[in-house]
Amino acid sequence: MFTRLITTSALTGAIALTIGSQAFAQTELAWWHGMTGANNEMVNELSKEFNESQSEYKIVPVYKGNYPETLNAGIAAFRSKQPPAILQVFDAGSGVMMAAEGAIVPAAEVLEKGGYKFDKSQYLPGIVAYYSKPDGTMLSFPYNSSSPILYYNKDAFKKAGLDENKPPKTWPEVFEAAKKIKASGASPCGFTSTWLTWIQTENFAAWNNVPYGTNENGLAGTDVKLEINSPLYVEHFQAIADLAKDGTFRYGGRTSEAKQLFTSGECAMLTESSGGLGDVVKSGINYGIGQLPYYEGHGPQNTIPGGASLWVFAGLSDDQYKGIAEFFNFLSQTKIQVKLHEKSGYLPVTLAAYEETKKSDFYEKNPGRETPILQMMGKEPTENSKGVRLVNLPQVRDILNEEFEAMLGGKQDAKTALDNAVKRGNAAIAAAQ
């Protein structure tokens, strides 16, 4: 995928580590990740395929817990001077990594160390921009980028008297369908959602073209004041809180736990990452895909990337950097990207892979599978929809989750929850400056 350079840049400023004294000794590269289920199987499959394609380097995938746990493990390992070669960091952790100058080596630089030239024009623009510095330098490699979508149980829709081939498009339509599903007994629960922070606040802002925070949600400056207690957010979360009172909406957890409520048949609708598709398919449920719901008069605008990217620490050996470059080049190959996209639901990060998938009529044969790509690429981003970048976004998400959980537990209404989240979140952001 990348262009091979005639000369390879020498490693500068890194601490050389001894890998082995024997000539042609294989260099092991630990890849710490947070993938489970079908996505963990894909990590193992790709690692095995790369290892069998050459003999100099060996990728060793290691599951380190969920996304936040993997990020924390990587930071702790770097501080103890024992970092992995590659660390998978979820979208919310990007600001943390970007702020750690000197601790990481940009992906573009790693590729040059391995003799490759990175050409950002070969990648989906929205993904490249999200993981790059303002000057365009690619900081991390976009392994599994995703967009949130609506999954729905076609059998439950049919039992409830809803059109199984017509998923709801707006949030009011989702809420009405959820009530009808529960009232009819088609499913015990009408609607659930994974990642209330990423989907229902960050992407909610982008998709409905409303501010998440000041300074273009942190992309124009680090001094950010949250704006997630404006009227549209309050209306949206109060509707969810009201549905939760009788179980029409069920809360599964802070990350992807709610996916189990859908794949088990308990809840008939789910907003979740496109990358959750592998487990949905594996469950055997009769599912359909719809675009992320929006509010009339506000959306749809564009979604922002989720999922995760691969980061490389400073202080590795020349051989490790060269091996990582070879692995990134392997992951960029069109056939690998097509496989990752078609099997997992994650986006094809290269334009070549996207075009190849279209040419094969995959999207015609699999309705809805192009939806997450079209959502992200459909419109030119506005200052509200370029993304969210906070140096402590994982911490801010924790604060929001605490307030959402109190709201869903009936301890406070949506306005109180969001007002508290803004007050506490702003204090945390200011303290992190």
Curated annotation (Swiss-Prot):
Instruction: Please provide the record's keywords in A-Z order.
Output: Periplasm, Signal, Transport
Kindly state the subunit structure of this protein: The complex is composed of two ATP-binding proteins (UgpC), two transmembrane proteins (UgpA and UgpE) and a solute-binding protein (UgpB).
For this protein, the record's InterPro entries field holds: Bact_solute-bd_prot1 (IPR050490), SBP (IPR006059)
Positions with a binding annotation for sn-glycerol 3-phosphate? 67, 91, 146, 273, 307, 346, 397
Q: What is this protein called?
A: sn-glycerol-3-phosphate-binding periplasmic protein UgpB
Pfam families the UniProt entry points to: SBP_bac_8
Species of origin? Brucella suis biovar 1 (strain 1330)
Q: What is its main location?
A: periplasm
**Family named by the database record:** Belongs to the bacterial solute-binding protein 1 family.
Protein's cellular compartments? Periplasm
What does the protein in this record do?
Answer: Part of the ABC transporter complex UgpBAEC involved in sn-glycerol-3-phosphate (G3P) import. Binds G3P.
Q: Name one GO cellular component term.
A: periplasmic space
Query: Which PANTHER family does the record match to this protein?
Result: ARABINOSE-BINDING PROTEIN-RELATED (PTHR43649), SN-GLYCEROL-3-PHOSPHATE-BINDING PERIPLASMIC PROTEIN UGPB (PTHR43649:SF31)
Please state the gene responsible for encoding this protein: ugpB
Q: Which residues form the signal peptide?
A: 1-25
Give the matching CDD domains. Answer: PBP2_UgpB
